[in-house]
Amino acid sequence: FAPETENVDKLLEVCAEHGIIASLGHTEADYDTTLSVIAKAKELGLTVTGTHLFNGMPSIHHRAPGPVAALLTAAKAGDVSVELIADGVHLVDGAVDMAHSHRAFAITDAMAAAGMADGDYELGSLPVTVSGGVARVPSGAIAGGTSTLSQQFASFAARHGLGEAVRFTSTPAADVLGEANLGRIAVGARANLVGLNSHYQPVRVIVDGADISLS
Protein backbone atom coordinates (compact mmCIF):
# COMPACT_ATOMS: atom_id res chain seq x y z
CA PHE A 1 0.00 0.00 0.00
CA ALA A 2 1.01 3.62 -0.45
CA PRO A 3 1.37 5.52 2.86
CA GLU A 4 0.10 8.79 1.34
CA THR A 5 -3.31 7.40 0.36
CA GLU A 6 -6.57 8.10 2.18
CA ASN A 7 -7.81 5.81 4.94
CA VAL A 8 -4.33 4.44 5.60
CA ASP A 9 -5.01 4.39 9.36
CA LYS A 10 -8.10 2.24 8.85
CA LEU A 11 -6.16 -0.04 6.52
CA LEU A 12 -3.53 -0.60 9.20
CA GLU A 13 -6.24 -1.40 11.74
CA VAL A 14 -7.77 -3.99 9.40
CA CYS A 15 -4.34 -5.52 8.81
CA ALA A 16 -3.75 -5.74 12.55
CA GLU A 17 -7.19 -7.26 13.16
CA HIS A 18 -6.64 -10.01 10.60
CA GLY A 19 -2.91 -10.61 10.98
CA ILE A 20 -2.04 -9.23 7.54
CA ILE A 21 1.50 -8.13 6.72
CA ALA A 22 1.59 -4.43 5.82
CA SER A 23 3.83 -3.93 2.79
CA LEU A 24 4.63 -0.41 1.60
CA GLY A 25 5.16 -0.01 -2.12
CA HIS A 26 4.22 1.68 -5.40
CA THR A 27 4.31 4.94 -3.48
CA GLU A 28 5.39 8.54 -3.80
CA ALA A 29 5.13 9.29 -0.09
CA ASP A 30 7.69 11.63 1.40
CA TYR A 31 10.22 10.59 4.02
CA ASP A 32 8.31 11.82 7.07
CA THR A 33 4.96 10.39 5.94
CA THR A 34 6.54 6.99 5.34
CA LEU A 35 8.21 6.90 8.76
CA SER A 36 5.01 8.09 10.44
CA VAL A 37 2.98 5.28 8.90
CA ILE A 38 5.65 2.74 9.84
CA ALA A 39 5.51 4.00 13.43
CA LYS A 40 1.71 3.62 13.49
CA ALA A 41 2.00 0.10 12.11
CA LYS A 42 4.56 -0.77 14.76
CA GLU A 43 2.25 0.52 17.51
CA LEU A 44 -0.41 -1.86 16.21
CA GLY A 45 2.03 -4.77 16.32
CA LEU A 46 2.11 -5.22 12.56
CA THR A 47 4.84 -6.87 10.54
CA VAL A 48 5.93 -4.28 7.97
CA THR A 49 7.86 -4.75 4.74
CA GLY A 50 8.95 -2.62 1.81
CA THR A 51 7.71 -4.02 -1.50
CA HIS A 52 10.59 -4.42 -4.00
CA LEU A 53 12.58 -1.49 -2.62
CA PHE A 54 13.51 1.25 -5.12
CA ASN A 55 11.11 -0.06 -7.79
CA GLY A 56 7.79 1.77 -8.00
CA MET A 57 9.21 4.58 -5.83
CA PRO A 58 10.91 7.92 -6.53
CA SER A 59 14.69 7.90 -6.34
CA ILE A 60 16.52 9.18 -3.27
CA HIS A 61 17.32 12.89 -3.36
CA HIS A 62 19.53 14.50 -0.74
CA ARG A 63 16.88 17.12 0.05
CA ALA A 64 13.86 14.90 -0.54
CA PRO A 65 14.92 11.39 0.54
CA GLY A 66 11.46 9.91 0.03
CA PRO A 67 10.18 6.40 0.81
CA VAL A 68 13.36 4.54 -0.13
CA ALA A 69 15.46 6.35 2.46
CA ALA A 70 12.65 6.07 5.02
CA LEU A 71 12.43 2.31 4.55
CA LEU A 72 16.21 1.95 4.78
CA THR A 73 16.19 3.99 7.99
CA ALA A 74 13.41 1.87 9.45
CA ALA A 75 15.16 -1.35 8.41
CA LYS A 76 18.32 -0.18 10.16
CA ALA A 77 16.24 0.33 13.31
CA GLY A 78 14.73 -3.15 12.94
CA ASP A 79 11.21 -1.86 12.31
CA VAL A 80 10.73 -3.15 8.75
CA SER A 81 12.14 -5.71 6.34
CA VAL A 82 12.83 -4.77 2.73
CA GLU A 83 12.54 -6.82 -0.45
CA LEU A 84 15.26 -6.47 -3.08
CA ILE A 85 14.94 -7.73 -6.67
CA ALA A 86 18.65 -8.52 -6.81
CA ASP A 87 18.72 -9.50 -10.47
CA GLY A 88 21.01 -6.81 -11.88
CA VAL A 89 18.09 -5.45 -13.92
CA HIS A 90 15.63 -4.00 -11.43
CA LEU A 91 18.57 -3.15 -9.17
CA VAL A 92 22.23 -2.97 -10.10
CA ASP A 93 24.57 -4.78 -7.73
CA GLY A 94 25.71 -1.56 -6.08
CA ALA A 95 22.16 -0.66 -5.07
CA VAL A 96 21.65 -4.13 -3.62
CA ASP A 97 24.89 -3.89 -1.65
CA MET A 98 23.96 -0.44 -0.32
CA ALA A 99 20.53 -1.62 0.86
CA HIS A 100 21.70 -4.98 2.17
CA SER A 101 21.26 -5.52 5.90
CA HIS A 102 20.00 -8.17 8.30
CA ARG A 103 16.48 -6.97 7.46
CA ALA A 104 16.81 -7.26 3.66
CA PHE A 105 16.05 -10.30 1.52
CA ALA A 106 16.01 -11.31 -2.13
CA ILE A 107 12.84 -11.72 -4.17
CA THR A 108 12.34 -12.50 -7.86
CA ASP A 109 9.11 -10.59 -8.65
CA ALA A 110 8.82 -13.41 -11.17
CA MET A 111 6.39 -13.45 -14.07
CA ALA A 112 5.66 -16.22 -16.60
CA ALA A 113 9.02 -15.82 -18.35
CA ALA A 114 11.10 -16.54 -15.25
CA GLY A 115 13.80 -19.05 -16.14
CA MET A 116 12.54 -19.20 -19.72
CA ALA A 117 14.01 -18.20 -23.09
CA ASP A 118 13.58 -14.79 -24.70
CA GLY A 119 10.26 -14.37 -26.49
CA ASP A 120 6.71 -13.11 -26.13
CA TYR A 121 4.74 -13.63 -22.92
CA GLU A 122 1.85 -12.10 -21.01
CA LEU A 123 1.64 -10.36 -17.66
CA GLY A 124 -2.03 -10.47 -16.83
CA SER A 125 -3.62 -8.86 -19.88
CA LEU A 126 -0.43 -7.09 -20.97
CA PRO A 127 1.79 -8.35 -23.79
CA VAL A 128 5.41 -8.69 -22.68
CA THR A 129 8.55 -9.15 -24.74
CA VAL A 130 11.64 -10.66 -23.13
CA SER A 131 14.94 -9.73 -24.75
CA GLY A 132 18.29 -10.42 -23.16
CA GLY A 133 16.47 -11.76 -20.13
CA VAL A 134 14.68 -8.44 -19.53
CA ALA A 135 10.86 -8.36 -19.70
CA ARG A 136 9.24 -5.18 -20.98
CA VAL A 137 5.75 -4.05 -21.94
CA PRO A 138 5.30 -2.13 -25.23
CA SER A 139 5.95 1.20 -23.47
CA GLY A 140 9.41 -0.02 -22.53
CA ALA A 141 8.74 -0.32 -18.82
CA ILE A 142 10.15 -3.36 -17.03
CA ALA A 143 7.40 -5.94 -16.54
CA GLY A 144 8.26 -8.23 -13.66
CA GLY A 145 11.29 -10.41 -13.14
CA THR A 146 12.69 -13.27 -15.20
CA SER A 147 15.50 -14.32 -12.86
CA THR A 148 15.40 -17.31 -10.54
CA LEU A 149 16.41 -17.13 -6.90
CA SER A 150 19.36 -19.42 -7.60
CA GLN A 151 20.63 -16.90 -10.17
CA GLN A 152 20.35 -14.11 -7.63
CA PHE A 153 22.06 -16.36 -5.09
CA ALA A 154 25.02 -16.86 -7.42
CA SER A 155 25.43 -13.15 -8.07
CA PHE A 156 25.14 -12.22 -4.41
CA ALA A 157 27.48 -15.02 -3.27
CA ALA A 158 30.21 -13.76 -5.58
CA ARG A 159 30.23 -10.50 -3.64
CA HIS A 160 29.29 -11.53 -0.11
CA GLY A 161 30.17 -15.21 0.26
CA LEU A 162 28.10 -18.36 0.42
CA GLY A 163 27.00 -18.06 4.03
CA GLU A 164 25.53 -14.59 3.65
CA ALA A 165 23.97 -15.55 0.31
CA VAL A 166 22.17 -18.46 1.99
CA ARG A 167 20.82 -16.14 4.68
CA PHE A 168 19.86 -13.39 2.19
CA THR A 169 17.78 -15.79 0.10
CA SER A 170 16.05 -17.66 2.93
CA THR A 171 15.98 -16.68 6.60
CA PRO A 172 14.67 -13.07 6.59
CA ALA A 173 11.75 -13.93 4.29
CA ALA A 174 10.77 -16.82 6.55
CA ASP A 175 10.99 -14.54 9.58
CA VAL A 176 8.65 -12.01 7.93
CA LEU A 177 6.11 -14.80 7.49
CA GLY A 178 6.56 -15.85 11.11
CA GLU A 179 7.82 -19.26 9.99
CA ALA A 180 10.59 -20.00 12.49
CA ASN A 181 10.81 -23.57 11.18
CA LEU A 182 11.76 -22.42 7.67
CA GLY A 183 14.84 -20.75 6.22
CA ARG A 184 17.32 -22.36 8.58
CA ILE A 185 19.08 -25.65 9.20
CA ALA A 186 18.35 -26.52 12.82
CA VAL A 187 16.88 -29.22 15.02
CA GLY A 188 13.11 -28.98 14.74
CA ALA A 189 13.14 -26.96 11.52
CA ARG A 190 11.57 -28.36 8.36
CA ALA A 191 14.07 -30.20 6.17
CA ASN A 192 13.50 -28.09 3.05
CA LEU A 193 16.80 -27.86 1.19
CA VAL A 194 18.08 -27.05 -2.29
CA GLY A 195 21.39 -28.50 -3.46
CA LEU A 196 23.37 -26.49 -6.02
CA ASN A 197 26.28 -27.52 -8.22
CA SER A 198 29.45 -25.49 -8.71
CA HIS A 199 27.59 -23.29 -11.20
CA TYR A 200 24.85 -22.63 -8.62
CA GLN A 201 22.28 -24.58 -10.60
CA PRO A 202 19.76 -26.64 -8.59
CA VAL A 203 20.61 -30.35 -8.70
CA ARG A 204 18.71 -31.63 -5.67
CA VAL A 205 15.56 -30.56 -3.86
CA ILE A 206 14.44 -31.94 -0.51
CA VAL A 207 11.00 -31.06 0.88
CA ASP A 208 10.13 -32.16 4.40
CA GLY A 209 13.05 -34.59 4.28
CA ALA A 210 11.97 -36.26 1.03
CA ASP A 211 13.82 -36.01 -2.28
CA ILE A 212 11.82 -34.39 -5.08
CA SER A 213 12.47 -35.53 -8.64
CA LEU A 214 13.82 -32.79 -10.91
CA SER A 215 13.22 -34.72 -14.13
Language model features by range: what are they?
Residues 7, 147, 178, 208-213:
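Serine/threonine-rich low-complexity intrinsically disordered regions
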Residues 118, 175, 184-215:
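C-terminal cap of metal-dependent C-N hydrolases
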Residues 21, 81, 194:
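Residue-level detector of anion-binding/catalytic polar loops
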Residues 11, 15, 26-27, 33-164, ...:
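Active-site-adjacent C-terminal substructures of enzyme catalytic domains
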Residues 1-23:
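Active-site gating/metal-coordination segments in enzymes
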